[in-house]
Amino acid sequence: HSFFADGAAASAPSSADYGAFPHMNIITSAFLAARPKTLTASLIPVWAGCMVVQKLTGSWNASLALLTLTSCLCLQIACNFFNDAIDHAKHADTERRTGPVRMTASGALSHRTVMLIGLFFLLGACLLAFPLIELRGWPILAIGIPSLYFTYGYTGGPWPLAYKGLGEIFVILFFGLVAVLGTILVQIGTAPVVPGTLVESLAVYNAGIVTGIQCGLLCAVMISVNNIRDRKEDLTTGKHTLAVRLGEGKARAMAQSFILAAYITLPTSSRALHLNLSHTWWMWIPSILFGGYLMLLIRKTPADSRMNRVLALSSLHLLLYLATYTILPTR
């Protein structure tokens, strides 16, 4: 029940449909297993990284951004397929499930088929990364190799992160900090000064650190909400998410604190991005109000299928947050 595999797919078939799809078309089944509504998690860090580069250097490379995004999408889709198959093999998907139905558990796709499709997308991510490695060298490998492992190791391997209560930390680091800084690395490289400008690369990376943490925190809200929704089922299947370890009340407070932290750090990120917050603070009002409403929903919504709406709104909130950053003028 990872964020990657469930995410904001509130309108997907529910757990009540288990066993209803044994004869579903394989293409339709594979499309649902890819969880397309969750793939904004790959878009966000690439968008954020390019936004940082644009704000501080005045330009960004669309071709490199597209290559980075496509590679990230392949990794996330592979992760979604692995999660679908591995959670079923570990009996973590049951009839009590309140999230979207899993294709392996429903019988729509076999375990072997789902794993092979996951491997196909993993290979695609590797092939797409080769031009980036050729362009930027070993730092891309340093990011890529752990990313490849955790694509499988999120739910698989000897120490699956999702089963150890490390899902939120993983998302903050890899879908926030690492992905944003990786995008910046692809865009500007590691030279002391950004080519064609007088901007120091260190300033761009410093801004990327703050922005990456903010994006990671808001992505982690989605996995926290996901785990609150699935907590009762996870208690019976041995999946020790943070929601299971902390209890429902503390898990809700943690998700709210992630949203709060993303706004408390705005003055720091605004300075790093050369934004004049004192003159443009009013542009944040829609995002702040949305964030406050989301915090209220996280506190009040019952831990069942009604949380799927909160997941969808969490994704929209992240998009609004980053869109606000993007339209703000620099000093």
Task: Please annotate each region the language model reported.
Residues 48, 57-85, 141-148, 152, ...:
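Membrane-embedded alpha-helical segments that form the functional core of polytopic membrane enzymes
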Residues 102-193:
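Intramembrane alpha-helical segments
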Residues 19-67, 71, 171:
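Topogenic membrane-insertion module of multi-pass membrane proteins
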Residues 74-98, 220-243:
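Acidic (Asp/Glu-rich) catalytic motifs at the cytosolic membrane interface
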Residues 170-231, 249-252:
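Functional transmembrane core segments of multi-pass inner-membrane proteins
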Residues 95-136, 239-276, 316-319:
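Multi-pass membrane catalytic core of lipid/isoprenoid biosynthesis enzymes
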Residues 271-331:
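Extended hydrophobic alpha-helices typical of membrane-associated regions
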Residues 45-49, 169-184, 244-248, 312-325:
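Small-residue-rich segments of transmembrane alpha-helices in multi-pass membrane proteins
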